[in-house]
Regions:
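Mixed-charge (Asp/Glu-Lys/Arg
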Residues: 1-38, 43-151
Length: 151
């Protein structure tokens, strides 16, 4: 049975809230951006306002999918500025009482991975990534965002 769109949206919203909570517990002020804000979900920065960054959240519900889906158009991320990040959130299975897992990277690095994907140069728009396909140093790499904000 196909998953209704509103349930999929709840999964994405849960991912955004998890990321906001992780940033908050690290003392990083942040806010959810409006739903129609293009390519980003959260704004985070320093209290003095000297550094800000934008974060795109990609959530995956393991009871419904085993991969994160990116698109051919996300290859353009390879040219994004250093203040843009992606956080992949593996929501964890409620059936197994699992917690979330996170992979954090600069958006530029994610764009490069999209270009290196086997579907690059084909008519296939999908760029599917399983958690095992991500570079190991992306997992729980919250320091990537912290380092940027502390520059």
């Amino acid at each position: 049975m196909k998953t209704p769109q509103w349930i999929k949206k709840l999964g994405g919203h849960a991912g955004e809230l998890y990321v906001a909570a992780e940033l908050s517990k690290r003392g990083i002020p942040n806010a959810l951006l409006p739903e129609n804000f293009s390519d980003d979900d959260l704004l985070a920065g320093t209290k003095d306002g000297k550094r800000i960054c934008f974060i795109q959240v990609k959530a995956c519900h393991p009871d419904r999918s085993s991969t994160f889906i990116l698109r051919e158009t996300d290859e353009k991320w390879a040219d994004t500025p250093e203040n843009q990040f992606v956080v992949f959130v593996w929501l964890g299975s409620p059936k197994k009482n699992e917690g979330p897992r996170y992979w954090v990277a600069q958006k530029k690095a994610v764009g490069i991975e999209c270009v290196k994907h086997s579907a690059h140069g084909t008519h296939n728009w999908e760029r599917r990534f399983s958690p095992k396909a991500f570079p190991e140093d992306w997992e729980n790499n919250w320091q990537e965002i912290v380092r940027y904000l502390e520059k």
